[in-house]
Amino acid sequence: MRHRKSGRQLNRNSSHRQAMFRNMAGSLVRHEIIKTTLPKAKELRRVVEPLITLAKIDSVANRRLAFARTRDNEIVAKLFNELGPRFASRAGGYTRILKCGFRAGDNAPMAYIELVDRATEPQTEVATAE
């Protein structure tokens, strides 16, 4: 019985899962939107949201904890300089998962995971004929 066992294995051993989510969390912080499979996106949420909560209080201890979890100084800097202040007034729910169909090769359900308040590119207005 698998009572009280949280998280998905995703057909990987624990070190592979840890490395994969460390890399995916870095990509999500860097690009603010990534495309992945739906189960990976749902698990990534459990990794990224605590990092952003940690970044809301800028201290040396919190920066060291964030570095221990991401192993990338560029990501830590963006977390504490941009994302922490941006989400300071939000109590949680920093990410959004949008389903986007199925992968062509194996029909795996795909999804975009993005930060909720990410800066969108300005859309160019199409001139209408009058």
Swiss-Prot record:
Keyword Calcium: no
Domain of life of the source: Bacteria
GO biological process, one term: translation
Gene Ontology CC terms: cytosolic large ribosomal subunit
Gene3D superfamilies assigned to the protein according to its UniProt record, in alphabetical order: Ribosomal protein L17
Record-linked Pfam families: Ribosomal_L17
SUPFAM superfamilies noted in UniProt: Prokaryotic ribosomal protein L17
Example of a GO MF term: structural constituent of ribosome
Keywords of the record: Ribonucleoprotein, Ribosomal protein
Subunit structure: Part of the 50S ribosomal subunit. Contacts protein L32.
Family: Belongs to the bacterial ribosomal protein bL17 family.
The protein's name: Large ribosomal subunit protein bL17
